[in-house]
């Protein structure tokens, strides 16, 4: 959020006087380091004929958000940041109590290498859920684990896990 809010075009309250092109490029470059895991980069999966080196790969990420309105990106980030199911009068900030109130069966499937939603977070939540299973996606694709676009291995894992879960 900070890179968008630091843009000279930012006017506060989620509004921009104009699209902050440089801030969105920085946003994309920063996100490249968080969207995918260190293992992804070590394995060289970022390399292709179109991106023969890290600099070329990062240039692709720098332009990834060119067509996305900065206000939309900021709103999405703020929703994610505020996403606390216990932050309400019913649960009073008590996350274990809020989790225990969930009656649906829950299949927790974080990416094994996700830098945002870590397996450890779900491990801490699991004991508070009534009927849940933790099944990390064994992927080096970080936050993008399970994204079926161009990832047949993750797709197959997800399909089988959901098939077994639904019985």
Task: Walk through the language-model features, giving the residues of each.
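Long, compositionally biased charged/polar accessory segments in the mid-to-C-terminal portions
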Residues: 69-71, 75
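Short beta-strand/loop motif that positions the catalytic acidic residue
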Residues: 102, 108-110
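Active-site nucleophile elbow and catalytic-triad environment of alpha/beta-hydrolase enzymes
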Residues: 57, 75-98
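Short, conserved loop/helix-junction motifs that constitute active-site signature segments
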Residues: 99-103, 127-130
């Amino acid at each position: 959020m900070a890179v968008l809010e630091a843009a000279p075009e930012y006017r506060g309250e989620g509004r921009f006087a104009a699209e902050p092109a440089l801030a969105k490029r920085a946003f994309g470059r920063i996100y490249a380091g968080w969207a995918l895991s260190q293992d992804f980069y070590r394995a060289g999966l970022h390399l292709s004929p179109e991106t023969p080196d890290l600099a070329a790969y990062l240039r692709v990420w720098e332009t990834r958000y060119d067509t996305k309105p900065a206000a939309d990106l900021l709103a999405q980030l703020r929703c994610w940041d505020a996403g606390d199911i216990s932050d309400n009068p019913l649960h009073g900030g008590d996350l274990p109590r809020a989790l225990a109130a969930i009656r649906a069966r829950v299949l927790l499937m974080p990416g094994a290498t996700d830098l945002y939603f870590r397996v450890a977070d779900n491990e801490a939540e699991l004991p508070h859920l009534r009927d849940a299973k933790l099944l990390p996606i064994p992927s080096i694709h970080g936050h993008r684990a399970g994204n079926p676009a161009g990832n047949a291995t993750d797709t197959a894992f997800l399909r089988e896990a959901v098939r077994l879960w639904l019985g």
